[in-house]
Structures are given as C-alpha cells and as structure tokens.
C-alpha cells in the first residue's frame, strides 16, 4: 500500500475550503432546496437500505471525499487487502479474515500457499464437532449429554463470540452458552457456581495459550472440574482453539480437540474462525455458515462495487469528514434491537483498537485526528439515558441508527412502537425545534407569555445533528454477517485514508508488562521503581 499523508492531497485541501463554506448550513435547508436529496444519498443493496442523506454533506462533499479516496489509492489498497499482501507491516502479516468466509474454490495465497483448503478443513471439523455436541453423540465423562458450554477467552476471543451469540439468540438451540473473560475471580466463580461438571464443555480460546487472563481462568475452571472428575477426563470436557499444541497438550487437552488458528487473522476479526466455535455450538453449524455467507457477500460488495454505491466506503468517508473537518471525536451506534445489546461494545474494540493510532505508516507522528471514540446502547433505552446530550449538548456526535423492518416474534404492536421511535429520532436530530415552534406549542397548552419567556430557551433544539439510517429487512445470521463485515471494511478504509496500520495493537503491551512486574511484587512485598502515586497505592493494597 502507498503511504500518503492525506493532508498533503489536493482533495484534503479542497475539503478544508469546502468545510468553511458549508459548516454553518442547516440540513433542513439542504432538504428544502433539493426534493430528491434522499434519493441521491441512499444505497439499497440486497436486504440493506442505507439512507445517509441526513448528513451535513452535499454532492460536492461526496465528490471531494471520493477524490480523497482516489488520491490515497484506496482501490489498490483493497486489492492488497484481499490479495494476501502483508499489509500489517509492523508484524509482517497479511490481514485475511476475509479468507475465512471465502468460497471454497477461492485461491488466496499466503507465502505462495493457498490457505482456503486448510480453512475448509477446519470448518468441516467445526461442523462435525458442533453436530456431535448438539445431538448428544459426544458425551461427558459420565455418559451424559452436554447441556452447557463455557467459552474462556479475552479480547477478540470473547467479544466477537459473545456479541454474535447474543445477537442471534433467537436462533439458539438447547445448549446454554456462557462466557468467562475477565481475570476477576468473582466473575469466574459466579459463572460456574451452578454448573454441573458432568455436562459442561469448556472452550479455551487463546492463540498462544499463554494469555494471562485466559490461562488463569482456565486453570481455575480445571481445578473446579477435577474436584468431581479424575485428571484423565479433562480431555472429554476441554477443547482448545490455539496454535500452541504443546502447551495445550500439557494442559490435558486431547490433540483431536484442538482447533487451529492462523497468524494472518487478528483477534478482533477472528469470530469467523474456530474462535467462533461457541457460536456454531449455540446456533448450529448451518446458521454459523449463513453468518459467514453474509460476510462474504459484503466482502464481494466492497471489492466489486463502485465507490459511489459502496456502503463501507461511503460510511467511512462520511466518518472521516466529521472526524477531521468538523473535529467530532466520537460516534454513537444505536441498534433498535435489544438482541444487538453487545454490538456497540464489540465495535469499540474493532474500531478503537484498530484505528487508535498516532503514528503513520511512515513511522511519523500524525498531525491530524485518527480513530473515533465509539459508544452506544440499544434504542429505545438509550433515548432515556444519553440522547439528551446528542440533542442539546455542545458536542457534535454523528450517530448510526440500525433497525430491522420485521421483528422475529412478529409482534407488530411492539415493532411499530419501536420503529416509530427509530424514525422519529433521526427526524428530530435533523430538524430540531425552533423558538417559534416552541412558543406555538406552549401557547396551545395555555401557557402565559411570562411562562413561555421563562422556559422557551430550554426547549429549543438546534437540530442539524447527523445520522446514518441502516434499515435491514430482518435480523438473521446472514444479515448479521453482512452488518459486521460492513463495519470491518469501514475500519479498513479509514486506516488507508489516515495512513495508519489498523491491524496491530502495540498500545496494549506496556500495561501487560507492568502488570506482570506488579504481580511479582505482591509476592515479594516490594514496591520499588514506581512513581510515588503508584507506590503509595500498592502499599495500601498490600497492607
């Protein structure tokens, strides 16, 4: 990929001038002046209807953003991304989570070897294992079928699987799936306290099988299991997803119960691999395959569609417009589905760990904003929590509204109430409420002029708050796969434009190193070589 500082491009300089021209324009006027605005800024693709017309953009804005993508050689970068080039240059690795959902006849090479046949082998193993656990063919050490699955992992080995299993809960089978991630012992013991060791299967997910949190939790769970079963039965109840075969075998896991990972798949993009075994067990392999199919369809859309009609490209460029020109620092993601409760927190890792970088691909400090802060909660809960700040606060917060035309239980009364709020919020954020409208409303309620003058300023909404409306036919495994992949590719586009490496995460290393040092000090009762604040805190903790 070419390393281009975006601020040096012609398009960037023109966008700076363009921003000065339109920064004070109100979107209401944009709509009033163009009756076809919604048509011009809507993309309908398969079961996705994405309206991005409620943004502070014009056709000129879009043209300049597309010019920026061209000047940053986005098309070449996409080819490098899907072609298996080592675009994660700080670790000298390709970034090929897309290969995990590629067609079985695809040819995707890493070090001159097609990786797709190996991916297909692992998928077949996931399928067979899932089917055997779900139908009771594979049993626990006392001959009972499994009833509970516990996934032990952290970061990408947890956030993706837990998000998808909760999002697709409607499609779950009889197995109960639990997740242990935090090294907090209370979290571990609370999860396992009511489980039956005879009918519980544990999945330990760690690429290196050395991650402190995961290994500590796995060891605690094994000790709990061994209070009821002999050591030799560990192999029937513990499965590993890892590359470290020796460490896994030393733990007591049978080699046939080891599922491989690859270093060309980053943790936060790994749910499509055997890391997603818990997903396959929860919803069945056919639904897991549908999830992958949906992601592959979004991959194809991203690769093959012109940038003008390309969902990930358009959403990424609009995000850059706000981040770098309006200086917006955060984006909210609001799914109008309680099933997607964990989706914003999943995106927090995917986006913030990927693009939270301050050094560009040339090794130079950037002099422009990069990664956005991501946050959100499902609607309508979020309306009663933090929408006040979005509507009347001092910060510009672009917001994605994700909704579904059809509910899963087909309760039209509830669905209509939910979606009425979904549409109303984007309209309210667009239009706001003027002082004149407030006065008229209060007069209609028989308020005196004195009362109106006292409170009217507090009831004015400026509006002009940008939103994207992502409306999907129905929440299915396939549509969920498309949605996740949409944001994955948005991350990639932003990283290309910002000239940063999106697929490493060196920022998490220092804290780990210091934690290991402090852990040793708890045993030795020493607090040397710390700042005065940390030293005092450690002494208080150890007292």
Curated annotation (Swiss-Prot):
<keyword id="KW-0324">Glycolysis</keyword>
<dbReference type="InterPro" id="IPR023096">
    <property type="entry name" value="G6P_Isomerase_C"/>
</dbReference>
<dbReference type="InterPro" id="IPR018189">
    <property type="entry name" value="Phosphoglucose_isomerase_CS"/>
</dbReference>
<keyword id="KW-0312">Gluconeogenesis</keyword>
<keyword id="KW-0963">Cytoplasm</keyword>
<dbReference type="GO" id="GO:0048029">
    <property type="term" value="F:monosaccharide binding"/>
</dbReference>
<protein>
    <recommendedName>
        <fullName>Glucose-6-phosphate isomerase</fullName>
        <ecNumber>5.3.1.9</ecNumber>
    </recommendedName>
</protein>
<dbReference type="GO" id="GO:0004347">
    <property type="term" value="F:glucose-6-phosphate isomerase activity"/>
</dbReference>
<feature type="active site">
    <location>
        <position position="512"/>
    </location>
</feature>
<dbReference type="Pfam" id="PF00342">
    <property type="entry name" value="PGI"/>
</dbReference>
<comment type="pathway">
    <text>Carbohydrate degradation; glycolysis; D-glyceraldehyde 3-phosphate and glycerone phosphate from D-glucose: step 2/4.</text>
</comment>
<feature type="active site">
    <location>
        <position position="384"/>
    </location>
</feature>
<dbReference type="InterPro" id="IPR046348">
    <property type="entry name" value="SIS_dom_sf"/>
</dbReference>
<dbReference type="InterPro" id="IPR035482">
    <property type="entry name" value="SIS_PGI_2"/>
</dbReference>
<feature type="active site" description="Proton donor">
    <location>
        <position position="353"/>
    </location>
</feature>
<comment type="pathway">
    <text>Carbohydrate biosynthesis; gluconeogenesis.</text>
</comment>
<comment type="similarity">
    <text>Belongs to the GPI family.</text>
</comment>
<dbReference type="GO" id="GO:0097367">
    <property type="term" value="F:carbohydrate derivative binding"/>
</dbReference>
<keyword id="KW-0413">Isomerase</keyword>
<dbReference type="GO" id="GO:0006094">
    <property type="term" value="P:gluconeogenesis"/>
</dbReference>
<dbReference type="InterPro" id="IPR035476">
    <property type="entry name" value="SIS_PGI_1"/>
</dbReference>
<comment type="function">
    <text>Catalyzes the reversible isomerization of glucose-6-phosphate to fructose-6-phosphate.</text>
</comment>
<dbReference type="GO" id="GO:0006096">
    <property type="term" value="P:glycolytic process"/>
</dbReference>
<dbReference type="GO" id="GO:0051156">
    <property type="term" value="P:glucose 6-phosphate metabolic process"/>
</dbReference>
<dbReference type="GO" id="GO:0005829">
    <property type="term" value="C:cytosol"/>
</dbReference>
<dbReference type="InterPro" id="IPR001672">
    <property type="entry name" value="G6P_Isomerase"/>
</dbReference>
């Amino acid at each position: 990929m070419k390393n281009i500082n975006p601020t040096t491009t012609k398009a960037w300089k023109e966008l700076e001038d363009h921003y000065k021209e339109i920064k004070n324009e109100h979107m209401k006027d944009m709509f009033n002046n163009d009756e076809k605005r919604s048509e011009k800024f809507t993309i309908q693709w398969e079961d996705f209807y994405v309206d991005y017309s409620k943004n502070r953009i014009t056709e000129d804005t879009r043209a300049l953003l597309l010019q920026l993508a061209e000047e940053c050689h986005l098309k070449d970068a996409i080819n490098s991304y899907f072609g298996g080039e080592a675009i994660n240059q700080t670790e000298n690795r390709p970034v090929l989570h897309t290969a995990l959902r590629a067609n079985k006849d695809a040819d995707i090479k890493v070090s001159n070897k097609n990786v797709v046949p190996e991916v297909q082998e692992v998928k077949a193993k996931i399928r067979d294992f899932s089917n055997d656990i779900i139908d009771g063919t594979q049993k626990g050490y006392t001959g009972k079928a499994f009833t509970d699955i516990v996934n032990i992992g952290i970061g990408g080995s947890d956030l993706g699987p837990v998000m998808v299993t909760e999002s697709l809960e409607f499609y779950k089978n009889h197995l109960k799936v639990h997740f242990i991630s935090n090294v907090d012992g209370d979290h571990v013991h609370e999860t396992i306290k009511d489980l039956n060791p005879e009918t519980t299967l544990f999945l330990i997910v760690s690429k290196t099988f050395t991650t402190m949190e995961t290994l500590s939790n796995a060891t605690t769970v094994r000790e709990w299991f061994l209070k009821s079963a002999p050591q030799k039965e560990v192999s029937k109840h513990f499965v590993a997803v890892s590359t470290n075969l020796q460490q896994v075998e030393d733990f007591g896991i049978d080699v046939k119960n080891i599922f491989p990972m690859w270093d060309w798949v980053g943790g936060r993009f790994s749910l499509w691999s055997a890391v997603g075994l818990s997903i396959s067990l929860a919803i069945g392999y056919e639904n897991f395959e549908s999830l992958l199919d949906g992601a592959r369809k979004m991959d194809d859309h991203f690769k093959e569609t012109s940038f003008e009609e390309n969902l990930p490209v358009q959403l990424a460029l609009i995000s850059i417009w706000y981040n770098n020109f309006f200086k917006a620092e955060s984006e909210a993601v609001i799914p109008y589905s309680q099933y997607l409760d964990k989706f914003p927190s999943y995106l927090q890792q995917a986006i913030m760990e990927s693009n939270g970088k301050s050094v560009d691909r040339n090794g130079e400090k950037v002099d422009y904003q990069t990664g956005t802060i991501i946050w959100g909660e499902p609607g309508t809960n979020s309306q009663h929590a933090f929408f006040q700040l979005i509507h009347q606060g001092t910060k510009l917060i672009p917001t994605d509204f994700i909704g579904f035309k059809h509910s899963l239980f087909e309760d039209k009364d509830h669905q209509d109430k939910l979606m009425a709020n979904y549409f109303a919020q984007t309209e309210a954020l667009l239009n706001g409420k003027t002082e004149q409208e407030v006065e008229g409303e209060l007069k209609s309620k028989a308020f005196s002029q004195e009362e109106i003058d006292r409170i009217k300023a507090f009831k004015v909404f400026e509006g002009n708050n940008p939103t994207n409306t992502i409306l999907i036919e129905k929440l299915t495994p396939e549509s969920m796969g498309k949605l996740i992949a949409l944001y994955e590719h948005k991350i990639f586009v932003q990283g290309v434009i910002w000239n940063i490496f999106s697929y490493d995460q060196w920022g998490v290393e220092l804290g780990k190193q210091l934690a290991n040092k402090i852990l040793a000090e708890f045993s030795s009762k020493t607090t040397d070589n710390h700042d005065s604040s940390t030293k005092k805190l450690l002494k208080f903790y150890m007292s």
